[in-house]
Curated annotation (Swiss-Prot):
Name assigned to this protein: Cytoplasmic polyadenylation element-binding protein 2
Compositional bias of kind Pro residues: 1-11
Function: May play a role in translational regulation of stored mRNAs in transcriptionally inactive haploid spermatids. Binds to poly(U) RNA oligomers. Required for cell cycle progression, specifically for the transition from metaphase to anaphase.
A GO term from the CC aspect: ribosome
Principal subcellular localization: cytoplasm
Gene that encodes it: Cpeb2
Region (Disordered) residue spans: 1-35, 50-88
Pfam families associated with the record: CEBP_ZZ (PF16366), RRM_7 (PF16367)
Keyword RNA-binding annotated: yes
InterPro entries according to UniProt: CEBP_ZZ, CEBP_ZZ_sf, CPEB, Nucleotide-bd_a/b_plait_sf, RBD_domain_sf, RRM_dom
Polar residues bias (residue ranges): 55-70
Record's subcellular location: Cytoplasm
The entry's keywords: Cytoplasm, Phosphoprotein, Repeat, RNA-binding, Translation regulation
Organism: Mus musculus
Amino acid sequence: MNLPQQQPPAAAPQQPQSRRSPVSPQLQQQHQAAAAAFLQQRNSYNHHQPLLKQSPWSNHQNSGWGTASMSWGAMHGRDHRRSGNMGIPGTMNQISPLKKPFSGNVIAPPKFTRSTPSLTPKSWIEDNVFRTDNNSNTLLPLQVRSSLQLPAWGSDSLQDSWCTAAGTSRIDQDRSRMYDSLNMHSLENSLIDIMRAEHDPLKGRLSYPHPGTDNLLMLNGRSSLFPIDDSLLDDGHSDQVGVLNSPTCYSAHQNGERIERFSRKVFVGGLPPDIDEDEITASFRRFGPLVVDWPHKAESKSYFPPKGYAFLLFQEESSVQALIDACIEEDGKLYLCVSSPTIKDKPVQIRPWNLSDSDFVMDGSQPLDPRKTIFVGGVPRPLRAVELAMIMDRLYGGVCYAGIDTDPELKYPKGAGRVAFSNQQSYIAAISARFVQLQHGDIDKRVEVKPYVLDDQMCDECQGARCGGKFAPFFCANVTCLQYYCEFCWANIHSRAGREFHKPLVKEGADRPRQIHFRWN
């Protein structure tokens, strides 16, 4: 018997069906409509986590993301902006995080395009614990100078950072139980380290004067959650200690004043042999007012850099950042094309100095003792404080601080450094060696090591009683002495047998220790 077909009311909405086989076109449309409604609701709730679709770029991108996703437990739909520096393939510009060196496999967010180095993937809790806001492009990599601001425990911001891609805004208790046995122990230890770091603000902190570094999570010179392996420094991948999330990363302002990140003096190497000073100035004038200089320029009176390199002295620090943004990065180095009368578009190396590389504290719990500090002369200018600290610590151990001497005006390295030790044995071993071979990357140089001499110390023998309370002008660097002496006490002590050949070190004004007819024994 043929029954009349009942037409559904036009105004009645279709009820989504959770499980139905599309045996008819009408049911298939209902299934598609239900799926579209679910996707629309999911995207509207978690709009900053776009669904992963088939990439129109190339297949190797999908495979690259798939590998990284599987290492985190195959959680699909994760925001790729939250996975910076956590095993995602790519290359980070160690000097200018804002600059996009080359098109990589990672599709970066449109606001701050950057790539990050490939490191070992971390667990899902370690990946998300550094997420500091609900909808942010901020990447928090494994950099020492990142200005991390963790929300209070139990806050919505920290909990939202652990949400799954399905749109859960709170930690699912059932799911958290599943991860308790795997990650909660390490998370608890990490949080304890964080609280200790907050109570001990100098523990592992770099000597960086900006207030944005108040919450650095560095313990013993390393991140409490993401330990840096020494091989990263050996391979030249660690940028110490760097700077991706420092307050100056985006040319930020604090209290209405712009924060400087780089020295206004920039090294330029590999210049064409026939380029003169005016042509160098013309090549870089578009970045801002500058002066071209090179060693012994005034004495030589030459218009051509004699060794193919020069220094650019910019009037404003912002010009240096503009120059960096215009460069091309290759193998961790910056290049810019410069033309001369006979050579067109020759790539020259641009080597800026990051101010944050001038100091490195490996262990802030140890007090800095100037009598356990050495002076290192002839330090290559590309060498950073973190690299100097690692080299000395591998040789002698007990390093708690390293610094690179910079000139007060341009804040550019002067070719000398300081290293403080936590124990007398390491200090004596270093000064007894007299010379150290600094090897790091392209750097391989023999440098001189001396005790670090101060000009405000009293005589260790008479405590100023025989010299009218004046500071001691002499320091004996022989391991049998290692003391400051006034003129009277020096003559008295070193007239004894076995000490007549000791020679003093002095420090004049703001100069570094200078040797006076010194002979090591």
